[in-house]
Amino acid sequence: CLTSIGQYLRACGNAIGLLADRALSFRAGAALHLSDYGMYGLLQLSCGTLRESVDRAVRYQRLSTPTMAIDAVVEGTQLLWLLRDEAGDLPAELRLFLVEQQAAQQVTHMSDLLGEACSPTLACFAHPAPVHRDRYAELLGCPCVFGWHRHEIRYPGEILARRPGLANPLAATMLESVCDGQ
């Protein structure tokens, strides 16, 4: 089944309008594992180090039909996933849903790569604290800050050298050439 970004945004908007469940966005993000992303996800799972996986996630993100752009930077001793909310033309409630979903998705993908022991140290959000702010820390597994200058999820930088559980450098090389051809 191929779903366009527009169709997905309409479905999210409909869900927001029909359900009063403030955790839906987090549950949706947590349900999107790397194995659901075809070659894009398999490439990340196959990389020899987390640093390689992070690099490939950013480089090939267009293959994941993204609703939000991601970037990764190392600042000091921390790895930061940056979530770029560039959908200013969408309703505020839908934008919040997408930010929450993407945050949960990034946490899920890191767990897919390194296991349950890989939790963020802090999540920062550019939006003001929503009414369900207490759920953020519970659902993301870390303290959360609101009113920050950008959306970011922080991890200890030393995890970049860790080997993903399904690492297979030969498969990663082959999958990267397939992704390059897309």
Identify the meaning behind each predicted range.
Residues 130-131, 135-182:
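Extended mid-to-C-terminal alpha-helical interaction segments
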Residues 37-44, 86-93, 160-161, 180-181:
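Short hinge/gating elements
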Residues 95-99, 103, 168, 172:
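Short, charged, low-complexity patches
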Residues 60, 105-109, 113, 178-181:
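Conserved short hydrophobic interaction patches
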Residues 47, 55, 64-99, 108-129, ...:
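Conserved binding/catalytic microenvironments
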Residues 1-80, 132:
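N-terminal low-complexity or simple alpha-helical regulatory segments
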Residues 12, 54, 103-106, 179:
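Hydrophobic alpha-helical core bundles mediating ligand binding, dimerization, or RNAP-core interactions
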